[in-house]
């Protein structure tokens, strides 16, 4: 008896499935060279276009770099030409200066140094001149009296002459110490006082009061008067402003009727002060604010010769007392208490 064989189909096998996935074999015509080139021709064309584009860009950049290099080279050539030209000029100038043996720049520096030396010598000369002038000023000021000195530490002097006192305080500080010592010695020398008290009775049609005068005279040596002061309380006689101006250098000239009728019983001093103020001497006047003053005795005719006075000061101080008949101050208010301080240096006659 025969055995039956069982045949197994591969259609459902794994190998058959994998084989069926493979593409079918192309024909032999497609595997030829021409067919292959025809298939890749588009891609080859794209590659060619890309290569041409890259080449054009690179070529353009290279040309730009070349043009810039050419421009830089041209500028460098010009600069080199200028450098060579300048170098040639410098060498030529150096040769000329070396041959002449003189450097103009050094000559200019030497001239400048000479000018500076001249200015320094001029400044030194000016300083010496200023110091000589100050020495002369200090010498002249030292010969004056202490109350007439200008080179002192008073603030008003330094305000008028700030530069002068700055130099004095810097280089001549010892002068202020010497001036202070001299003023103390001068005050001690003038300590002698002579007190003369005199009483004057003045009769008037309107007033019957008496006037007391205290006359203090301070004589010193060398025939000079240093201080003359009058303090009094005159009787109350009104004098008009018009008539008060009519006082001359010889005494009372024209006043009102009450004043013209008065009698001076005692031979006391009658002092006038006329305005505007005048200098006692037109040549040797130190203080500007002093006025012409004559002190006379009516009967004895003893007078101070003001024409011989060299310098002096008169100060009048108003108060709240009216003027009297025995003492007239023109151009002042009628409500005053006359106080006169007179300073002379040299007076020919000082007998009272």
UniProtKB/Swiss-Prot annotation:
Subcellular locations according to the entry: Cytoplasmic vesicle; Vacuole; Cytoplasm
Start and end residues of each stretch annotated as Disordered: 299-318
Major localisation: cytoplasm
Protein name (record): Biogenesis of lysosome-related organelles complex 1 subunit VAB2
Family: Belongs to the VAB2 family.
Complexes and interactors: Component of the biogenesis of lysosome-related organelles complex-1 (BLOC-1) composed of at least BLI1, BLS1, CNL1, KXD1, SNN1 and VAB2.
Protein origin, superkingdom: Eukaryota
Organism: Vanderwaltozyma polyspora (strain ATCC 22028 / DSM 70294 / BCRC 21397 / CBS 2163 / NBRC 10782 / NRRL Y-8283 / UCD 57-17)
Coiled coil: 57-133
Residue ranges, compositional bias (Basic and acidic residues): 299-308
Any GO CC annotation of this UniProt entry: cytoplasmic vesicle
Protein purpose: Component of the biogenesis of lysosome-related organelles complex-1 (BLOC-1) involved in endosomal cargo sorting.
Swiss-Prot/TrEMBL keywords: Coiled coil, Cytoplasm, Cytoplasmic vesicle, Transport, Vacuole
């Amino acid at each position: 008896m025969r055995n039956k064989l069982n045949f197994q189909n591969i259609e459902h096998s794994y190998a058959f499935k994998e084989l069926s996935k493979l593409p079918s074999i192309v024909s032999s015509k497609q595997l030829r060279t021409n067919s292959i080139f025809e298939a890749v021709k588009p891609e080859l064309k794209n590659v060619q276009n890309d290569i041409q584009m890259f080449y054009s860009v690179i070529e353009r950049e290279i040309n730009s770099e070349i043009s810039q290099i050419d421009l830089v080279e041209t500028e460098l050539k010009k600069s080199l030409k200028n450098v060579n030209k300048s170098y040639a000029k410098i060498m030529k100038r150096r040769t000329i200066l070396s041959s002449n043996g003189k450097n103009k720049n050094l000559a200019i520096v030497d001239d400048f140094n000479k000018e500076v030396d001249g200015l320094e010598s001029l400044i030194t000369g000016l300083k010496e001149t200023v110091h000589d002038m100050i020495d002369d000023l200090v010498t002249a000021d030292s010969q004056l009296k202490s109350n007439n000195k200008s080179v002192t530490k008073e603030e008003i002097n330094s305000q008028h002459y700030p530069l002068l006192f700055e130099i004095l305080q810097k280089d001549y500080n010892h002068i202020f110490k010497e001036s202070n010592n001299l003023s103390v010695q001068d005050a001690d020398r003038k300590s002698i006082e002579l007190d003369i008290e005199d009483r004057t009775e003045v009769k008037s049609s309107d007033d019957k009061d008496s006037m007391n005068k205290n006359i203090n005279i301070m004589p010193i040596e060398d025939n000079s008067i240093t201080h003359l002061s009058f303090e009094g309380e005159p009787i109350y006689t009104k004098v008009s402003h018009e008539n008060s101006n009519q006082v001359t250098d010889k005494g009372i000239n024209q006043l009102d009727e009450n004043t013209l009728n008065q009698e001076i019983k005692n031979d006391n001093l009658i002092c006038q002060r006329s305005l505007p103020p005048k200098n006692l001497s037109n040549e040797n006047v130190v203080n500007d604010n002093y006025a012409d003053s004559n002190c006379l005795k009516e009967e004895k005719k003893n007078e101070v010769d003001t024409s011989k006075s060299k310098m002096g000061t008169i100060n009048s101080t108003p108060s709240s007392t009216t003027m009297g008949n025995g003492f007239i101050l023109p151009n002042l208010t009628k409500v005053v208490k006359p106080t006169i301080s007179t300073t002379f240096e040299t007076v020919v006659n000082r007998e009272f």
